[in-house]
Amino acid sequence: MKNLLLYNKIILFFIAIIFIISCNKSKNENDDYFFPGKEWVDNNGIAINAHGGGILFHDNTYFWYGEHKIEGKIGNTAQVGVHLYSSKNLYQWKDEGIVLRVNETDPSSDIYKGCILERPKVIYNKKTKRFVMWFHLEPINRGYEAARSGVAISETPYGPFKFLESVRPNAKTWPLNVQDFHKKKVSSEVKKIYGGGPEHLPKHVDSLNILGRDFEVGQMARDMTLFVDDDKAYHIYSSEDNSTLHISELSEDYLSHSGRYKRFFPSKFNEAPTMMKTSSGKFFIVSSGCTGWAPNAARSASANNILGPWKELNNPCVSRDSLTTYNSQSTYILPVQGIKDAFIFMADRWNPENPIEGKYIWLPIEIADDKVEVLWKDKWNLNFFKK
């Protein structure tokens, strides 16, 4: 009887060992996968909090900068600042803390607590050896009418970033593709700010001449991204009451605008712009429509030069739920290092009622026949690009 009990204990012990090994193996296998739309935790087991973000690759490390959200609708405003995570492999992320904090002591600061600080992006300037952050900024209690761009700087990718100023881009400067009618006197009808999407604009943006309206004070800049091409940096943003996309060259130190810019897709209402460049030199933009927090069908466009001309393409999403961009909105296109023409479409699944519960959608991009396609995958990893 004692031998039987001992035998049973030994059997149970080995079953437990096998179960633990199996669980650990399963856990380790899943560590090297992306699960779009599922909770994604950091090295501390806490959900990653970097919404509307972008990624910088520097010194063999990926740095993910994004909006830090808190619980409740108040989380749609900036209560903390910009959060940073770092990774060597894109699957596991280490919490590096808050790298740009909102100002909690000076109500006159443009980044005073409660402002709207969205879509932070960071690029590295090889000449100045500084890390430069740009973001969409709406000072507190202004709603979305200010449409400004904030800029901050740091000596390391880990911060802290020092807020320098906020601006309306390209004040008193016409775009390279300005038309004669833009320079004519602006009617009083256009003096007000139009909010929201195309349903709020009474006429075509060129008939209203919103470009001319904002000539003196600078152009509006809301949803945005940054792109570095051959050491020149560009600020791409929704302008003219969200109706028109601007691609604007930055100064050599990346801290201001050079004055060289063009406007594209007037009255097409492109938000959430993202950009990529293939090894063949082809540029692609993937953006969204303008429907507030509600998801919509993505758009895409291609060009052989970053300043155009740009050719409009179709919705790049080709799997189920393509008409809502898989219930998400674009935020960045990430080039995977070490793999030719490997790009990840980064998007946010917003939750405006409780922003901290927003999820991340990372999906592979396929390049085919001079177009890009974003494919839905419930589970995938970087081996997708090694086929």
Outline where the language-model segments fall.
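Carbohydrate-active catalytic/glycan-binding domains of CAZyme proteins
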Residues: 24-387
